[in-house]
Curated annotation (Swiss-Prot):
GO terms for biological process: tRNA wobble uridine modification. S-adenosyl-L-methionine binds at Y40, G65, S66, S67, D90, N91, D122, I123, N137, R204. GO terms for molecular function: carboxyl- or carbamoyltransferase activity; S-adenosyl-L-methionine binding. It comes from the Bacteria. This is Carboxy-S-adenosyl-L-methionine synthase. CDD domains: AdoMet_MTases. InterPro entries: CmoA (IPR005271), Methyltransf_25 (IPR041698), SAM-dependent_MTases_sf (IPR029063). Belongs to the class I-like SAM-binding methyltransferase superfamily. Cx-SAM synthase family. Keywords: S-adenosyl-L-methionine, Transferase. It is an enzyme of class 2 (transferase). It comes from Pseudomonas fluorescens (strain SBW25).
């Protein structure tokens, strides 16, 4: 996977465009997400561990919004249940191309990995097969808020009894002081990882119109409304969290 440093917002831009998962972002994405999302490596690796507890024989494991395939590869490494396969879906052609290259390289390094299919497509239009695990890793926040419940309802309908949805998202907070504190701490995290004030400000301008975070309470209420019976937060670092939702 590319190790090119993220310098996309290092120089002043006359007009900051909306953030998009284009070739420029794909090229630096591993560095960008590691330096921007506290706890990201822990979430990815443990998502595979958690999935292994819910995977059922001869079922599908979905990675929705798969980007470069980090979660897909964690699923393939940790799940050993007979007959499982992974379907990774992303709507960015650049991401899908690099994801396929990365996973093909992993196939040559590891034996007995789960089979995987990488699809370029819109997860809102996806026809789900019966699934035991669905991963939505920092994906829902980029979907229009009024389309989130319908997607989660369809995921719930596709889940086999005993399956699980694992949902990771950036959070907003209803309490203004709590929101301000965790926002400031997140900025401090990015500074500590080498981002300048200019980079932080321009990235914020680029992403604020395309990423709409929810509060933990909103996530819980929406998941219950979608038909899930149990919602358990299993990880949080600053304003980033991951939940397990059970049917």
């Amino acid at each position: 996977m590319s190790k090119e440093p993220d310098r996309l917002f290092a120089q002043p831009l006359p007009q900051v465009p909306d953030f998009a998962f284009n070739e420029d972002v794909v090229r630096v994405f591993p560095d960008m997400i590691k330096r921007s999302v506290p706890g990201y490596p822990t979430i990815v690796e443990n998502l595979g561990v958690l999935a292994a507890q819910f995977a059922q024989p001869h079922s599908v494991l979905y990675d929705l919004g798969s980007s470069l395939g980090a979660v897909t590869q964690a699923l393939r490494r940790h799940v050993r249940t007979d007959g499982c396969r992974v379907i990774a879906v992303d709507n960015s052609a650049a991401m899908v191309e690099r994801c396929r290259e990365y996973l093909n390289g992993q196939d040559s390094m590891f034996q007995e990995l789960l089979p995987v299919e990488v699809i370029e497509g819109d997860i809102l239009a996806l026809q789900f097969a019966p699934a035991s695990v669905v991963a939505l890793n920092f994906t829902l926040q980029f979907i229009a808020p009024d389309e989130r419940l319908a997607l989660l309802s369809r995921i719930r309908q596709s889940l086999l009894p005993g399956g699980a949805l694992i949902l990771s998202e950036k959070l907003r907070f209803n309490d203004p002081e709590e929101h301000a504190l965790l926002t400031d701490l997140h900025i401090a995290f990015k500074r500590a990882n080498g981002y300048s004030e200019l980079e932080i400000a321009q990235k914020r301008s680029a992403i604020e119109n395309v990423m709409k975070p929810d509060s933990l309470e909103e996530h819980r209420e929406r998941l219950l409304a979608a038909g899930f019976s149990t919602v358990v937060p299993w990880f949080q670092c600053l304003n980033f969290a991951s939940l397990i939702a059970l049917p």
